[in-house]
């Protein structure tokens, strides 16, 4: 009888794989939601906020880290785990996290996805990746395989933690035995952050709608970008009958510079871009991603 | 042999002949299309009026991605023209664009004669006179105009 009660207690204290999976999904939503918010405000504030795009790219993971660290400090769980009422405990002793484990958890939780995202971005853009980057990506593949194996073992109750990261840190997930003791200020802040969680879901839904609109919806007619005022000599030099502004001959392999809208020969614009990094007509900075091949039917 | 630079220069020459701008002219030397001789007539209503100033333009195979080297052969008293005839003009240096053809270059230099930029002087005497003693400046300019008749 006592043994049966003890078994039931243990089973009730162990979260199911579905709650863990849901909490991980919520954690993974933070970065794209923040990026989407930055994009929105960035576009509204100033179109030429171009230089600070890098800052935005680095600001989102930093804010994500701060959010996760706050939750790990106050509730011994990540943002997503806290939302589903879970808590991280030391596997052997059942104690809560110490400072070092909090820091390590937040860092691994935030920057492993960040590094992987960077690697995949570079590979999809066909940039020259060095051998160590290839090996690092292979390591990520191995990690995901190990995680899948861990999840399976956890599902069949063979392992006490669901992820290699948790095994590495010596942690496991449990339901807290008593409600968290917090002061008023902490309670208010964490409640506001939980409201933010619903907002994240809304942003995801909005983003999906946004993408769907872009694919098949009706396009509002955008205002044409104003034409840059060129010096008089340049205006007079530009060809009148559709020739390439650089070689002044018939355009071969037409390529548009999406930053300025002018069309050049592929060879002319690429050689100029590699040397100067600017549009030949407007001097706006351009990169290879700004060149658009134009096909004639 | 035909290279992008030479094809572009033949195009520039053709445009210069078909649609000649006012007050400037130019043509390649007989045996080398990479070296041009040009003439700029002094703009009206300026001290340079009636002057005929000769220039040489040297192109490289990197043209039009790199600007040519342009020098006055005639003596020119101007804040932005060096003693050796070199020209201090932004579109021939950091603000060069491959869309400038020979016609645009010569027209820009002609405009420079009307509107000097004394803040980046190539000839400090001319820049100083232009700012402080306009009468003496114009007298010196007229002297080089008369000199250009003889050349």
Curated annotation (Swiss-Prot), chain A:
TM helices/strands, residue ranges: 17-44, 49-73, 99-119, 125-158, 192-219
Pfam families listed in its UniProt record: Pex2_Pex12 (PF04757)
Membrane topology listed for this record: Multi-pass membrane protein
Topological domain ranges for the Cytoplasmic compartment: 45-48, 120-124, 220-297
Spans within the Peroxisomal matrix topological domain: 1-16, 74-98, 159-191
Superkingdom, taxonomy of origin: Eukaryota
UniProt keyword list: Membrane, Metal-binding, Peroxisome, Protein transport, Transmembrane, Transmembrane helix, Transport, Ubl conjugation pathway, Zinc, Zinc-finger
SUPFAM superfamilies in the cross-refs: RING/U-box (SSF57850)
Pathway listed: Protein modification; protein ubiquitination
Tagged with keyword Iron-sulfur: no
Binding residues for Zn(2+): 244, 247, 265, 268
Keyword Protein transport: yes
GO biological process, one term: protein polyubiquitination
Subcellular location: Peroxisome membrane
Zinc fingers classed as RING-type: ranges: 244-283
Annotated GO CC locations: peroxisomal importomer complex; peroxisomal membrane; peroxisome
Any one GO molecular function term: ubiquitin protein ligase activity
Function: Component of a retrotranslocation channel required for peroxisome organization by mediating export of the PEX5 receptor from peroxisomes to the cytosol, thereby promoting PEX5 recycling. The retrotranslocation channel is composed of PEX2, PEX10 and PEX12; each subunit contributing transmembrane segments that coassemble into an open channel that specifically allows the passage of PEX5 through the peroxisomal membrane. PEX12 also regulates PEX5 recycling by activating the E3 ubiquitin-protein ligase activity of PEX10.
Family per similarity comment: Belongs to the pex2/pex10/pex12 family.
Subunit structure: Component of the PEX2-PEX10-PEX12 retrotranslocation channel.
Domain topic, free-text comment: The three subunits of the retrotranslocation channel (PEX2, PEX10 and PEX12) coassemble in the membrane into a channel with an open 10 Angstrom pore. The RING-type zinc-fingers that catalyze PEX5 receptor ubiquitination are positioned above the pore on the cytosolic side of the complex. The RING-type zinc-finger is degenerated and only coordinates one zinc ions, preventing E3 ubiquitin-protein ligase activity.
The name this protein goes by in its record: Peroxisome assembly protein 12
Organism: Drosophila melanogaster
From Swiss-Prot, chain B:
Principal EC category: transferase
Chief place of localization: nucleus
Keywords: ATP-binding, DNA damage, DNA repair, Nucleotide-binding, Nucleus, Transferase, Ubl conjugation pathway
Domain of life: Eukaryota
Gene Ontology molecular function: ATP binding; p53 binding; protein domain specific binding; ubiquitin conjugating enzyme activity; ubiquitin-protein transferase activity
Domain (UBC core): residue spans on this chain: 4-150
A single cellular component GO annotation: cytoplasm
Disruption phenotype: Lethality during the second instar-early third instar larval stages. Mutants show defective synaptic function as a consequence of mitochondrial failure.
Record EC number: 2.3.2.23
Role this protein plays: E2 ubiquitin-conjugating enzyme that accepts ubiquitin from the ubiquitin-activating enzyme E1 and transfers it to a E3 ubiquitin-protein ligase. Required for postreplication repair of UV-damaged DNA. Involved in the negative regulation of the Ras/MAPK signaling pathway in the wing by acting with the putative E3 ligases poe, Kcmf1 and Ufd4 to mediate the ubiquitination and proteasomal degradation of rl/MAPK. Required for in mitophagy.
UniProt-recorded name of the protein: Ubiquitin-conjugating enzyme E2-17 kDa
Native organism: Drosophila melanogaster (Fruit fly)
Name of encoding gene: Ubc6
């Amino acid at each position: 009888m006592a043994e049966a009660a003890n078994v039931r207690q243990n089973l009730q204290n162990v979260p199911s794989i579905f709650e863990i999976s849901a909490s991980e999904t919520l954690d993974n939503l933070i970065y794209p939601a923040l990026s989407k918010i930055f994009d929105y405000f960035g576009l509204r504030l100033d179109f030429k906020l171009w230089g600070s795009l890098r800052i935005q790219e680095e600001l989102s993971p930093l804010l994500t880290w701060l959010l996760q660290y706050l939750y790990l400090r106050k509730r011994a769980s990540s943002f997503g785990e806290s939302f589903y009422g879970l808590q991280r405990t030391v596997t052997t002793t059942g104690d809560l996290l110490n400072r070092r484990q909090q820091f390590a958890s937040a860092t691994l939780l935030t920057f492993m996805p960040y590094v992987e995202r960077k690697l995949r971005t570079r590979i999809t853009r066909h940039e020259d990746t060095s051998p160590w980057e290839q090996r690092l990506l292979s390591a990520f593949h191995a990690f995901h395989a190990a995680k899948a194996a861990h999840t399976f073992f956890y599902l069949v109750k063979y392992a006490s933690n669901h992820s290699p990261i948790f095994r590495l840190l010596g942690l496991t997930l449990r339901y807290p035995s008593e409600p968290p003791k917090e002061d008023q200020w902490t309670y208010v802040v964490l409640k506001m952050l939980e409201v933010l969680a619903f907002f994240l879901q809304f942003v995801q839904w909005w983003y999906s709608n946004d993408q769907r609109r872009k694919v098949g919806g009706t396009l509002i007619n955008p205002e044409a970008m104003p034409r840059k005022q060129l010096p008089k000599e340049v205006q007079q030099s530009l060809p009148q009958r559709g020739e390439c502004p650089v070689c002044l001959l018939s355009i071969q392999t037409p390529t548009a510079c999406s930053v300025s809208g002018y069309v050049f020969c592929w060879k002319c614009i690429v050689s100029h871009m590699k040397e100067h990094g600017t549009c030949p007509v407007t001097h706006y900075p351009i990169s290879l991603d700004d060149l658009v091949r134009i096909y004639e039917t | 042999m035909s290279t992008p630079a030479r094809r572009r220069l033949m195009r520039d020459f053709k445009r210069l002949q078909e649609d000649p701008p006012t007050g400037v002219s130019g043509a390649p030397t007989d045996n080398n299309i990479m070296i041009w001789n040009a003439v700029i007539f002094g703009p009206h209503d300026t001290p340079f009026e009636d002057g005929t100033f000769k220039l040489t333009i040297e192109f490289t195979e990197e043209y039009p991605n790199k600007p040519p080297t342009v020098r006055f052969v005639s003596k020119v008293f101007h804040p932005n023209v060096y003693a050796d005839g070199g020209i201090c003009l932004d579109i021939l240096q950091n603000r060069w664009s491959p869309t400038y053809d020979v016609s645009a270059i010569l027209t820009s230099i002609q405009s420079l004669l009307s509107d000097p930029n004394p803040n980046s002087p190539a000839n400090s005497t001319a820049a100083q006179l232009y700012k402080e003693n306009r009468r003496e400046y114009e007298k010196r300019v007229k002297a080089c105009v008369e000199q250009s008749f003889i050349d």
